Amino acid sequence: MVTPTKHAIGLRSASGVELLAHIGLDTVTFDGTPFSLKVKEGDTVKKGEVLVEFDKAFIEDIEESALHQKIFTVVS
């Protein structure tokens, strides 16, 4: 799963474990501006592969604590 705003990516392992990677707190409000996706929904990814890149300065200018909060949630 990749959100349209590019701030969150959902992953599912071969064994079915699901993980949500969420960058920042209110980064959904940026409407994708500071993010550059390197994968698309349905892609198979490997350890070490870059999933998303983002403009750290852009996020820090707007949301001082955004990059100090990275949320990873196992959903299964």
From Swiss-Prot:
Q: What taxonomic classification does the UniProt entry list for its organism?
A: Bacteria, Bacillati, Bacillota, Bacilli, Bacillales
| Active site residues according to the UniProt entry | 22
Which protein are we looking at? Putative phosphotransferase enzyme IIA component YyzE
**Could you tell me which cysteines form disulfide bridges?**
none
Assigned keywords, A-Z: Cytoplasm, Kinase, Phosphotransferase system, Sugar transport, Transferase, Transport
InterPro entries under this entry?
Answer: Dup_hybrid_motif, PTS_EIIA_1_perm, PTS_EIIA_component
Native organism is Bacillus subtilis (strain 168)
Show where the PTS EIIA type-1 domain sits: 1-76
Principal place where this protein is found?
Answer: cytoplasm
Q: Where in the cell is it found?
A: Cytoplasm
SUPFAM superfamilies found in the cross-reference section: Duplicated hybrid motif
Q: Which Pfam families match?
A: PTS_EIIA_1
Tell me which Gene Ontology terms the entry assigns under biological process: phosphoenolpyruvate-dependent sugar phosphotransferase system
Under Gene Ontology molecular function, one entry of this record is:
kinase activity
> What is the UniProt domain comment for this protein?
The EIIA domain is phosphorylated by phospho-HPr on a histidyl residue. Then, it transfers the phosphoryl group to the EIIB domain.
The primary gene name is yyzE
GO CC aspect terms: cytoplasm
